Amino acid sequence: MAIESFDVAIIGGGPGGYVAAIRASQLGFKVACIEKRETLGGTCLNVGCIPSKALLESSELFLQASKHFENHGIIVSKPQIDVPAMIARKDKIVKGLGDGISSLFKKNKINRIAGLGKIIASNRIEVTDKTGSKSEIEAKFIIIATGSEPASLPCLPMDGEFVVSSAEALNFKSVPKDLVVVGA
């Protein structure tokens, strides 16, 4: 099987990676972007900045309706939180922005490769897809834009129920009675 060659290969499809891919393509380079997630946008779009801000906006509106509308002469009977609706709104925002990035990739003819990229030589990347199958590509230039992952504390490992990552916190089914945030 022949190894496909690119001018530029970017490992990571988050804000650094997808912007680099789009710009490189606009400058006339043949570009590949390797991303381990199903969707582009990285931590920021999928499980970080964007979804948390969407939920914060919903929470702020709830607070305004609960405590401050009366100051403006607006009477609202007791507001209630519908967590599934808030999560659905957050998911719709994330999907829309992710679809926008995918559209830009298509428009700019960027080869999107799903999998985990590993540099194995100065111009070669091994890609492992979600089934464990491996392939290789080569590129004159490689950009590493792998972003961030939540870190677990050795003394308090994440269990998905009582100790959760930011990704899991963005999908709570209800508002927790108590919550402690470690890190920022």
Language-model segments: which ranges?
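N-terminal Rossmann-fold NAD(P) dinucleotide-binding loop
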Residues: 17
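Glycine-rich flavin
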Residues: 2-6, 22-175
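Beta1/beta-strand and adjacent pyrophosphate-binding region of the FAD-binding site
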Residues: 2-14, 177-182
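Short flexible/disordered coil segments
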Residues: 101-103, 181-184
